Amino acid sequence: MQKGLTIYLNGKPLSGKRVELLLSDNTIPYHTEGRIDSVRYKLIAGLGGIGEPKLSGWYIYCNNRLVLEADTSSITGWGVQPIPKWHINYAMFRGVLFLDSEETLNLPLTTTKKGIDATSEVYKAILPLMKNGMIKVFEFLKKIPQMGDEANDYRAMLWENTPKIGAVELKALNFSNAEKIFVAPPLNTDVIARKKNTVRIAYDVAKQTAETAKEHAEA
């Protein structure tokens, strides 16, 4: 478990995979925090890993209890204008919302305390902030497929070469940049080539020349 704080899911200590976001000088999550009535909130939206799309979505903690995990439903704004429904192109999206109150009854929990009450006035006030964070991150994620064959290499390179931070650390982190701004990493195929120590060269040659080169390579 992440040091200094125990996270619970349905009353049990959570020992599963860490919720991690990329954080570096040129990759900084969207974030905002404040208070609505007696509820304190801290919201972070950014980039996570690839290869496990089921981990994509929103994670909502109420008094350090995880009540919504990897949610991509309308409860967290997905598929509700102007937010699109979840798509594999958004698999790197990670959103984390921390809600804290001295009075548990003031938190936007369902009667079973195992989910989020989307009709709560507190939650309805925060949802637009969540959507704004999604829009900022999606603007970047929508550009990656335009890289064509390099898209997956770029996603992998980001995850492998960018420092990461866990949910607990995020809650305690004092961000140095302004609120409600997502700092996206550079979208540059040359970066991928340098990381791979290779340069991709593509050009057309006559068929006979290509066959001759192939014969020499196989000799």
Language-model features, listed with the residues they occupy:
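ATP-binding catalytic core of ATPases
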Residues: M1-L9
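Charged regulatory segments coupled to nucleotide-binding catalytic modules in large multidomain enzymes
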Residues: D25-A219
